[in-house]
Swiss-Prot record:
<dbReference type="Pfam" id="PF00419">
    <property type="entry name" value="Fimbrial"/>
</dbReference>
<dbReference type="InterPro" id="IPR000259">
    <property type="entry name" value="Adhesion_dom_fimbrial"/>
</dbReference>
<protein>
    <recommendedName>
        <fullName>Uncharacterized fimbrial-like protein ElfG</fullName>
    </recommendedName>
</protein>
<dbReference type="GO" id="GO:0009289">
    <property type="term" value="C:pilus"/>
</dbReference>
<dbReference type="InterPro" id="IPR050263">
    <property type="entry name" value="Bact_Fimbrial_Adh_Pro"/>
</dbReference>
<dbReference type="InterPro" id="IPR008966">
    <property type="entry name" value="Adhesion_dom_sf"/>
</dbReference>
<dbReference type="InterPro" id="IPR036937">
    <property type="entry name" value="Adhesion_dom_fimbrial_sf"/>
</dbReference>
<comment type="similarity">
    <text>Belongs to the fimbrial protein family.</text>
</comment>
<dbReference type="GO" id="GO:0043709">
    <property type="term" value="P:cell adhesion involved in single-species biofilm formation"/>
</dbReference>
<keyword id="KW-0732">Signal</keyword>
<keyword id="KW-0281">Fimbrium</keyword>
<feature type="signal peptide">
    <location>
        <begin position="1"/>
        <end position="30"/>
    </location>
</feature>
<comment type="function">
    <text>Part of the elfADCG fimbrial operon, which could be required for adherence to host epithelial cells.</text>
</comment>
Amino acid sequence: MQIIFGEKCVSLLRLFFAAVLMLWCAQTAAYSGQCHTTQGNPYIGVNFGVKTLEEEENTTGVVKDKFYQWNESNDYYVSCDCDKDNVRSGRWAFAADSPLVYLGDNWYKINDYLAAKVLLQVKGSSPTAVPFENVGTGADTRWHICDPGGQRLGGQGASGNSGSFSLKILQPFVGSVVIPPMALARLFECYNIPAGDSCTTTGTPVLVYYLSGTINSLGSCSVNAGETIEVDLGDVFAANFRVVGHKPLGARTAELAIPVRCNTGNAGLVNVNLSLTATTDPSYPQAIKTSRPGVGVVVTDSQNNIISPAGGTLPLSIPDDADSIA
């Protein structure tokens, strides 16, 4: 009887330990380690301003390494799905992707003319090209990272706050390419307990990088075949100038037909910006100064918008290798 009783006790004890082990495993597996931003600024603006390419750089396949670099100091709070009772045994890991079309070899398509390769700096690692997963860091315990309110991260040394992107020419262009703010890359963060490097691009990114800027090209275009354009404004009586900023009475508007021709080797339309540069009239800066004090010339587009003589532009879309009129 004692032996039977003992066997029952042993069996019950084994079942108890098995139940405890299963419960512990279930609790351990319940934490994904994925992190999300709880407050602060989760966006980094990669605005490179206005840059100009030389004509020889504006060639298919040309790569401009580290075309733009940034080192921001965003402050934000991150909360991770992890065990706060064992936070000291955890480790950071990162992953990144891009919503842009992937072209291979870490290149992403910005538009028909340009592609970008993005490198992000993760603490303790060399700059890593997007896309990547399972990039771990050294020990860096954050006591409140598992709390719902999150842990404050920030400063230029924080992972993801610095990086760079390289530029690749997919096909030559003429004039300017304006890149409106677009999502360039996304950084995902994990805090793994026990320590590990596992992290994938699932869930919500902790940082999103927005690209914007303008790239000018010194392309092969000619205006009026390089010849001077003369405009006859006719004769106007001095008494007809009465209101500042208005045409004199009886004055006519001279329409300009400016021949423009581009040779880029591209099929389809070419985007061109004609730029106006002249001496401005000190009393009316929107006008070009003339030899007669108090009299200026105003240039407008087809919609009667004034083109500033201080670098105002007239955008055009014209066929390549064909004569066009602006």
